[in-house]
Amino acid sequence: GYELAVSQPRVIIKEVDGVKMEPFEEVTIDVPSQFQGAVIERLGARGFIMMNMVMHENQVRLMFEGPTRGLLGYKNQFIVDTKGEGILASRVLGFRPYAGDIQKRVVGSMISMIQGKALAFGLFGLQDRGQLYINPGAEVYEGMVVGNTSKGEEMTVNPTKGKQLTNMRASGSDDAITLVPPKLLSIEIGLEIMADDEFLEVTPKNVRLRKSKLTESERKKGSAK
C-alpha cells in the first residue's frame, strides 16, 4: 500500500514594483433565485465583489471578481448552499494587488487526544458540538481530526470514551444512543475543508485529516511563537 500527506492548496503570491500581487478570477454563477442570498454572502466574505446580476424568471446569474484563494474550498460549500442546483464557472483575470484577509473557514476542528477505536458513546457526546467525520469502530490517533466544531474553536476530544459500568445498570440504556450520519471524507472534500495547519492523509482504504503537529503540547508551542 501507500500513504500520501497533502497540505492545503496555496496560490502564488508575487511582488511587482514593491506591490504584493495575487491571481484574481471572474466567477459566473447561475442559481435559482432563492439561493442568491447565500451565494452573495459566502463569496463576499471570501473577498469577491459582485459586478453584475441578471434575473430571468426564477433563475439569477451573478458575476463576481475576486482573489483565486477565495475560491479554494468553496465549491463543496456552493453545492451545499444551492442544494446541487447551482452552476459555477470561473476564468483567470491575471494578477492584481493583494486583497487582504478573507474568511474561508468558519468551523474549527475536533482533534483526537488519544489513540484507539472510536466508540458510539464517545461520539454521541461530540455530535452536538459540530459535525463528525468518522463512524464508531474507526481507528483514531492523537492529532487526528475527527470532526468540526460549529462555533469555530478548536477542541481536543476523546472519541474512544466508553460508558462507565456500574453494578446497577439501567434497562435499555445502551439502545438510547442515536448518531447522526457523519460527513465521510473524500480527497475533494478534505482539500476544501482542511485548515492551514492540517494535512490530508490518503491511503488505499482511508482519507483522514490530521494536524501537522500531532500532540497538543507541540501545537501550543507553535502558537506561542
Locations of the language-model features?
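Accessory interaction regions appended to the cores of large information-processing enzymes
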Residues: 1-225
